[in-house]
């Protein structure tokens, strides 16, 4: 946390997220806006049960509103002031993560938690 109580976060995009973000067509400007939004309120997204802390947030395409939106899933490690951007997908490609995807992401989050604790 910065002096004056302002929250800070380092953002880490896993390679799969980076590919998905670009494939959806989001811009660097939209990524910066997402990062600013999550820095202000890192627990904004809905918590996805059984994933070890994954959250899902709606992200609107510029000029198309929330109806033409995507979902970004991330995990916030507040203690380490780090947010991992895990996955992104369009609303029309799927509504939610599958059970298998949630299980895989939980394993990834467990590995990330372990690696953070060792730093």
Features from the language model and the residues they span:
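Arg/Lys-rich, positively charged N-terminal/basic patches that mediate binding to nucleic acids
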Residues: 1-30
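Preference for short coil/turn "hinge" residues that link or interrupt alpha-helices
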Residues: 5, 19, 40-41, 76, ...
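A generic structural signal for short beta-strands and their flanking turns/coil linkers
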Residues: 13, 34, 53-55
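Compact soluble domain cores
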Residues: 16, 25-46
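Short helix-to-loop capping/linker segments positioned immediately adjacent to catalytic or ligand/cofactor-binding
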Residues: 22, 45, 117-118
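Basic/aromatic recognition patch in beta-strand/loop cores that engages polyanionic ligands
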Residues: 44-88, 93
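Enriched for short, Lys/Arg-rich terminal
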Residues: 76-119
């Amino acid at each position: 946390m910065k002096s004056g109580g302002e929250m800070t976060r380092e953002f880490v995009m896993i390679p799969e997220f980076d590919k998905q973000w670009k494939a959806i067509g989001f811009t660097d400007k939209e990524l910066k806006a997402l990062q600013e939004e999550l820095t202000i309120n890192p627990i904004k997204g809905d918590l996805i049960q059984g994933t070890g802390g994954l959250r899902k947030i709606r992200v609107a395409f510029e000029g198309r509103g929330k109806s033409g939106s995507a979902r970004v899933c991330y995990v916030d490690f507040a203690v380490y002031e780090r947010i991992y951007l895990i996955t992104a997908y369009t609303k029309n490609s799927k509504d939610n993560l599958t059970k298998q995807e949630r299980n895989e992401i939980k394993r990834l989050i467990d590995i990330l938690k372990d690696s953070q604790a060792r730093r």
